[in-house]
């Protein structure tokens, strides 16, 4: 199989495994990726979220709408630029971080079971370089 195919099926397997654990808290794998970005930096725009997650703005809108319905985020007009909407985590979302982070650790541990640290390091380097190759201008 090609590296692209293997990357794709691994992404889907990781997403499904994570979603199986997070869905009990009403969070999809896509929403998890948005929350992760907001936990790193709260109060950013939809465009910044889509760029950091690596999704289209349309996909971000859908994920943000679900998070807003679940009362995990709020969206408000940016005070410095009224054309932009700023996304902020609610207290509920901040508390949820402590519950969801262990799920990610669990999924990663299961995925890497039986693989040496040396091989994991090589895989990280290869995946990082393929990403750089594909996103270079």
Task: Mark where each language-model region is.
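Charged, amphipathic alpha-helical coiled-coil/dimerization segments
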Residues: 15, 65-125
């Amino acid at each position: 199989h090609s590296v692209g195919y293997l990357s794709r099926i691994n992404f889907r397997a990781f997403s499904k495994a994570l979603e199986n654990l997070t869905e009990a808290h009403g969070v999809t794998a896509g929403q998890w990726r948005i929350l992760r970005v907001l936990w790193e930096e709260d109060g950013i725009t939809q465009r910044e979220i889509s760029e950091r997650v690596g999704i289209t703005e349309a996909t971000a809108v859908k994920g943000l709408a679900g998070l807003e319905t679940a009362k995990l985020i709020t969206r408000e007009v940016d005070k410095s630029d009224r054309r932009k909407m700023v996304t902020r985590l609610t207290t509920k979302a901040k508390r949820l971080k402590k519950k969801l982070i262990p799920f990610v650790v669990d999924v990663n541990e299961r995925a890497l079971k039986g693989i040496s640290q040396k091989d994991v390091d090589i895989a990280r380097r290869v995946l990082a370089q393929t990403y750089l190759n594909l996103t270079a201008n």
